From Swiss-Prot:
It comes from the Bacteria. One of its GO terms (molecular function) is ATP binding. It holds the Pfam family IPPT. Its EC number is 2.5.1.75. This is tRNA dimethylallyltransferase. The record marks 99, 121 as: Interaction with substrate tRNA. InterPro entries: Dimethylallyltransferase, IPT, P-loop_NTPase. Its cofactor is Mg(2+). Residues 33-36 are annotated as: Interaction with substrate tRNA.
């Protein structure tokens, strides 16, 4: 028995098909999305609607407030706990989303017992303040694999990887390889033609703005959350903050959201190429009924066809 994981770029249509699939087999979704974890951020993160949630239960969304820290350690723990709860109910857990980092965390495992080291962390932060860019250079020396994987602007993860190294004497990358996740996942990747995906992104962003994205960010501001928070760096929110602060027009902010989302989708697609053994389903070349039949068959085969 293996665990199905359905991945796909943003706006590819994962939720749409999973909700329909839920009428055919008893599934529940464990979200693999690093932004839907935040409360009060519904429109910009494209969370399932109330209607969709009434048809298909989703786990690991609305987990923390926008100003709370949340890392891959906590995600993996909560996600696997949710999976166990779904299995106990006699239903099939389906991991679904687009976060490559969260997917890697589930499939490769992480070391959960490396404690936070505030002394090392503060020393690293001070070093970066005094010599900007120094932590990236340091990471390249001590953990080149992590250096290649972590975005240059992701200071939080850079500090964590260095923190683990200076605390344990071993790189987090090497520790992750030792502590493999015992659960075996089978990956199914949903894809679309590039032009079609770009068009879907354009339409989705327009719909987000029409549905109240600006008002959602205004509410976050009124609740006391600030644009400097990690959660507010999310595509869709960062650009609207710029609009609210008078830095760009609404038209320009919308254009930036579309552009940045397209770029993000391209990065996701490149990331998913690493899963050589994954089954790939083209949503552009297959009709809806056939897609649902394929997903149903694949999930039941992966799960062993046993549920209930």
């Amino acid at each position: 028995m293996k665990i199905p994981m359905i991945l796909g770029a943003t706006a590819v249509g994962k939720t749409q098909f999973l909700v329909k699939l839920a009428s055919l087999i008893p599934i529940e979704v464990v979200s693999v999305d690093s932004r839907q974890i935040y409360r009060y951020m519904d429109i910009g993160t494209a969370k399932p609607t109330r209607e969709e949630l009434s048809k298909l239960k989703h786990h690991v969304i609305d987990v923390v407030d926008p100003d709370e820290d949340f890392n891959v350690f906590e995600y993996r723990k909560i996600a696997l706990k949710a999976m166990d709860e779904i299995v106990k109910k006699g239903r099939i857990p389906v991991f679904a989303g687009g976060s490559g980092l969260y997917a890697e965390t589930l499939m490769k495992g992480i070391v959960e017992n490396v404690p936070r080291n505030d002394k090392v962390r503060e020393a690293l932060k001070t070093l970066e303040v005094n010599a900007p860019g120094s932590l990236r250079k340091l990471l390249e020396k001590v953990d080149h694999e992590a250096y290649e994987k972590i975005h240059p602007n992701d200071l939080k993860r850079t500090i964590r990887y260095l923190e683990v190294f200076f605390t344990t004497g071993k790189t987090l990358t090497s520790l992750q390889k030792i502590h493999k996740c015992s659960n075996q996942f089978t990956v199914i990747i949903l894809e679309r033609d590039r032009r079609e995906l770009a068009e879907r992104i354009e339409n989705r962003v327009d719909k987000m703005v029409e549905s109240g994205l600006i008002e959602e960010v205004v509410r976050l501001k009124e609740m006391g959350y600030t644009r400097e928070l990690n959660s507010q760096q999310t595509i869709g929110y960062a650009e609207i903050w710029s609009y609210l602060e008078g830095e760009v027009t609404l038209e320009r902010a919308t254009e930036l959201i579309k552009r940045n989302t397209r770029r993000f989708a391209r990065r996701q697609i490149i990331w998913f190429r690493r899963y050589k053994d994954a089954k790939r389903i083209s949503l552009s070349e297959t009709n809806e009924n056939d897609i649902l039949s394929l997903l149903k068959e694949d999930i039941l085969n992966v799960w062993g066809g046993k549920y209930g």
